[in-house]
Structures are given as structure tokens and as C-alpha cells.
A protein has these predicted regions:
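Active-site catalytic microenvironments in core metabolic enzymes, especially phosphate/sugar-handling
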Residues: 1-198
């Protein structure tokens, strides 16, 4: 609805194939208006200086190594973390990321190493355990991942898919403003967590 040339998104506007055209679908709106979309999804998650670097920096964690490597690219990080327990790290994530709710297990467990993976990273639990992490911090964690983590001696912090990736907007907007002073960059007002909690 605004005058722009490009929409830059983390999640692709067309994430799965379109089976029907719905008038309010963002892909339909963009196509009808002749607008362009550029999505930086898995490539930004895995890139050096990308999503997981930004997430670790916000949490005050320094990456030591990739949490999981595939095809020469890393996914998530293992970070050293001394003098904090799981509950304290969960609270830090809630405060720094602006989460309304953070779910976690094993709150009193002391942390020496933490696995960090933005978005939906429950699949990184085995890698976190294998790298000696006491906790995995990610989003979209299913109940069975919490149970598996407990059985492996690894706590899990679920700070939410939206909140562990929403950091993309401010980061990319800031980078674009710094590199292109004449470029108008706006963060969409529709960029919000639509999930309600009671």
C-alpha cells in the first residue's frame, strides 16, 4: 500500500507453492502492483555476520564454532557462557528480544556452553548435545524436543520463531541506511507477532 520498489523479507513471500490466489496474500499484492521481493532466508541464517551472529551479539554471547555444518556452511553457533543458569539466560532472551513468553526446561542448570539457532531449531538438539552444550536456545520447539533434551541432559529455551528472527528487520534496515544514505528504508507496520497469548 506504500510507494516502494522492493520488499526485503527474511521468510520468502512464496514459501510453498501457490495452489490458489487469495486477494490479501502478500505475493498476490506484490505481483498485482508490479513490485519486487527479495528474500534472505536460509542463506542469511547461515551467513557469517548473519542472523545467528546478530542473535548471539544481542544475547551477549560470543560464538566459538558452528553448531551444525552442512555443505560447508554453518547453522547456529556454540557459545561459551559462564556464570549463568538456564533461567537467567531465558530471562535475558525475553528482555533483549522483547518476547512475551519464553518457555524453557531445567532452569537451574548451570551453563558453560550454549547452542544458539534462530527460528525453528529443535532439530539442532542432537548437535547441541554432541558439542557439550548444557542448553539450546531457539524457537518453535515441540514438546518432544523438551523431553529429548531432558533425557540428554540438555535444557531447551524456546524464545519463539518470530522473536529470534524479527531482529532481521532492524539489522538489515540499519545496514541499508548506513550504506545507501539516499535510500528510503521502512520497516513494515505489519511486521509483528500475530500470535496472542492469554
Amino acid at each position: 500500500q506504500r510507494d516502494f520498489d522492493l520488499v526485503l523479507t527474511h521468510h520468502p513471500v512464496i514459501f510453498r507453492g501457490l495452489k490458489t490466489l487469495v486477494p490479501n496474500d502478500p505475493a498476490v499484492i506484490l505481483a498485482a502492483g508490479g513490485k519486487n521481493d527479495l528474500s534472505m532466508h536460509t542463506n542469511f541464517d547461515s551467513a557469517e555476520g548473519g542472523m545467528n551472529d546478530v542473535l548471539c551479539k544481542m544475547l551477549g554471547l560470543k560464538p566459538e564454532s558452528a553448531l551444525h555444518e552442512e555443505h560447508g556452511a554453518g547453522c547456529g553457533y556454540v557459545c561459551k557462557c559462564d556464570g549463568m543458569n538456564v533461567r537467567e539466560l531465558a530471562q535475558r532472551a525475553k528482555d533483549v528480544l522483547g518476547c512475551r513468553v519464553v518457555r524453557f526446561s531445567g532452569g537451574e542448570r548451570e551453563i558453560r556452553r550454549v547452542g544458539v539457532g534462530s527460528g525453528s531449531g529443535g532439530s539442532l538438539l542432537v548437535a547441541a548435545a554432541g558439542q557439550g552444550c548444557q542448553v539450546l536456545l531457539t524457537g518453535d520447539v515441540k514438546h518432544d524436543v523438551f523431553i529429548d533434551g531432558e533425557n540428554m541432559g540438555v535444557s531447551v529455551i524456546d524464545a519463539g520463531h518470530f522473536y529470534t528472527e524479527n531482529i532481521f528487520c532492524e539489522f538489515i534496515a540499519g545496514e541499508l541506511r548506513n550504506k545507501f544514505s539516499g535510500l528510503r528504508v521502512e520497516i513494515a507496520v505489519s511486521n509483528r507477532d500475530i500470535v496472542e497469548v492469554i
